[in-house]
Structures are given as structure tokens and as C-alpha cells.
Amino acid sequence: MDTKADRYEGIDGLKAYAIIGIALMHVLANGEYGIGGFVFERLIPSFTNLVFLFMMVSGFGMCCGYYQKIVNQKISVEDFYKKRYIKIWPYFALLCALDFVISPSKESLFEVFANLTLCQGLLPNAKISVIGVSWTLAVIFVFYMLFPFFCFLIGNKKRAWGVAVAALVFNWLCSNYFNDGRTNIVYDAVYFIAGGLIFLYRKELAEFVSKYKVIAGVILLVVSVTYFAAGSSTFTMLSFCVAALIYTLGCRTGGGVLVNPVAKFLGGISFEIYLCHMVIYRVLEKLHLVHLFGNGLLAYIFTAVAVICGSVVFSVCAKWFLNKIETFLKEKVNNRRVNHV
């Protein structure tokens, strides 16, 4: 993994704000609240595209942790994929089981099986409803499968730029010819490649942002405004994600909006929150709490806060529970080995 000196603390804050935005968007979209204005008609709905930011951060983060190990053959194929499954599968399996209990059906059982393999991202147009937001996980796991090939693609800067251009063209073809959207790894590849490119230039970019943080902030503001002025497109979203990730590289000192204990905590469990927040929403829905205060702003705020807080509590408790089980199983295996010696 990257060393302490190479750790980019601001990324946790970036992930924290991204997951809050996505949760706000899903609550608004599913609750069908009768509220209007720019914030509720354009700003919050646009947060759906923050999933692409997660993909870019995944590309960058995986490179920080494993690029040199893969290139220098310091990690075996078995160890690499084992770590991916061990990190994701237990928590995701628990969520799938809960989702099935909440809404049991034959179709859900089929989808749970697909989810538990973590290979659902290989299915064409799967449209899985069990943990529906996990399509992002499905795409990211396909990226994990292809990561050794990805390391080859960004093996040098010249090749990486060529691959980035090809990925951008492929993204356009997916939209305009092949009719494949964001649930397809080929469509999303440009975001992972962009994360890899930023990794290749990470030292220069971090130094630039540290020296000229105001300029980097202005660039981020400009691309954010452009996103709304020019409309949502791969180019505008890609520009925003790149500017946001680059800006965070220079945020290493505490006290800011990106580097603080709360942001670090939420960023550390951001993907767990992402996967569970709609399960929490469905529970609130079944308890008839989504419209407890009517259909207006107060009801939306209450539901959004309840979903976010509930997701945080669930994520922390679930991780604690799964860690206890893991520790118990390891101790049991170790005791058996001792007894056999």
C-alpha cells in the first residue's frame, strides 16, 4: 500500500461529500416530494453522476496501492483477488440477505446469487434490483478483474494518454452506437483511466495544488459551473471529476472541509454507506416514515437525515459484527492447526 507520506488525506473528504450527495439524490428521486427550484430540480438530481467520481477515485486508489506491486510482481494473482473478495464480499452478502428478507421473491433469489458471485458486472444489461445501487460495485469489480491489464495500459505516460483517448471515443460509441450506458465497464473505462493518469502525474499535481490552491479552486469552480451551464455530458462530468480529484491531492493538512475527523470517518465507510443507504430508505418506507411530515421540504430533510444517519450506524455496526465473526473464525482455524501439530 501507499506509505503514510504518500497518503492523500483529502480523498476521504471527497468520498464523504460524494456519498452524502448520492444519498440526497436517491431520497429525492424515490420520495417524489413536491418541492421545486434549482436545488431540487437540477443540483441534487445531478448528484447521480457522482458515481463516476467514485470510479475515478477507485482507479487512482488502486494504482496507489497495487500498481507497483503488480508491475514488479510483488503480489501473487491469488493474493490480489483474495484481498478484493475478502474486503467486499462479507458486507455485500449481508446486505443482499437483508434485501431478500425485506422483499423475498424467486426473481430476488436469482439476483442474490448473481450478486454473491461479484461477477454480475459481466452480465449484459442485467438490471438487478436487489441492492440496485450495486451496479457501481459490479462495474468496479470488473475493473478489479482487469487491473493487471489496466497496469499494462498505463505502463508509461505516452501509452496512457493514447488509451485515455481511445476510452473517450469508446464512451461516445457506447452512447451513440452500441446503446450501452453507465452500467457497462467499456462506457466507464475513461473514468478509471483518468484516475490512472492522475496517479502517473500525482507528485507534480500535488505540488502544483499545494503551491497554487486558489488557482486549483477556481478551476474546480469553473468546471462545476460549466457542468450546469453546458449540461451533463461525459466531457463536463469528466472535467469536474478530474478537477475535484486533483484539488484533493494538495489537501493534506487538517482543519479544512476535506481534511477533518468527520470527513475522514465518513470517507472511510463511504462505500459501505453507498451500498446500504437504499436498504435503510426501504425500511423507512415500510415503516411509513418517508412522508411522516407530509410531502414537502420538512419531510425530505427528515428522510434524508434519517437515511444518512441510519446508513452510518448500520455500516459501523455491520463492520464491527463482521470483524468479530472473522476474528472468531481465524481463532478457530488457528486452534485446529495447533491441535493437529
Region roles according to the model:
Residues 1-173, 269, 291-341:
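Membrane-cytosol interface segments of multi-pass membrane proteins
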Residues 54, 71-72, 124-125, 173-180, ...:
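Juxtamembrane membrane-interface segments at transmembrane alpha-helix termini
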Residues 58-61, 145, 193-200, 244-249:
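Specific aromatic-rich, kink-prone transmembrane helix
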Residues 101, 192, 221-324:
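Alpha-helical transmembrane segments of multi-pass integral membrane proteins
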Residues 105-107, 126-131, 174-183, 225-235:
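Membrane-interface helix caps and helix-loop-helix hairpins in membrane proteins
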Residues 110-111, 158-163, 181-188, 231-240:
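Short, aromatic-rich membrane-interface segments at the entry and exit
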Residues 129-136, 184, 207-209, 255-265:
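A cytosolic-side transmembrane-helix exit/cap motif
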Residues 165, 211-224:
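Signature aromatic-anchored transmembrane alpha helix within multi-pass, membrane-resident enzymes
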